[in-house]
Every structure is written in C-alpha cells, then in structure tokens.
Amino acid sequence: MILAGDIGGTKTAIALFDDSADELRLVRDGTFPSKDHGSLEEILARFLQGHEGPSLRAGCFGVAGAVIEGKCQTTNLPWHLEEEALARAIGAAHVRLLNDL
C-alpha cells in the first residue's frame, strides 16, 4: 500500500493506493481543511483510522515549501514536516516530501 498526498494551505488531499498488482488501484481518498488540523500527522491518523488492510510500504507528499534533507517548513501553514517522523507516524519504511512547485 502507498499513501500519497497534496498538502496545501487550504486543503490536504490524501489517497491510499494498493500496489500489489501491475497497476496502482485507488483504495480510498479524502480531503481535509488543512487549517483545521495542527499537523499533517493528525490528518494522516484521521485518514488511516480503521484501516485494516495490508501495511503501508511508502508515502509521498507534495508540499508548498523547500524540502531540504527530508525536512520542510511549509510556506502557508505553521507545519514543520520531516520524512522520518512521517514514516514513523504511518508505519511505513519510506516517506518522501516533494516540493509541489
């Protein structure tokens, strides 16, 4: 399973994909008002609540802000994101943050 997201100042869109076949299959997705939450970890916990499928292998999140050595201070939210902390939060071996340009 792969978790992907677009982290914006207004909304955060999250999607969970099954990667066990040749093509990715959307399992579920959701959108959350970013400013109603104190952190991305809070949103991810809410999104994953009740998930009983296979464990997550990886996560990837597009963010507004420079990503330096796996860390990002978002430009339009008071959030500090770190790949390692996010990986621990979702129980995945790998997480990447990407600047969304």
Regions found by a protein language model. Give the residues of each.
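Short glycine-rich, Thr/Ser-proximal phosphate-binding strand/loop in the N-terminal lobe
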Residues: I2-R46
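Short beta-strand-loop/turn "lid" adjacent to the catalytic site in phosphate-handling enzymes
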Residues: H51-L97, L101
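Short glycine- and Lys/Arg-enriched binding-loop motifs that mark or flank ligand-binding interfaces
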Residues: M1-G5, A58-F61
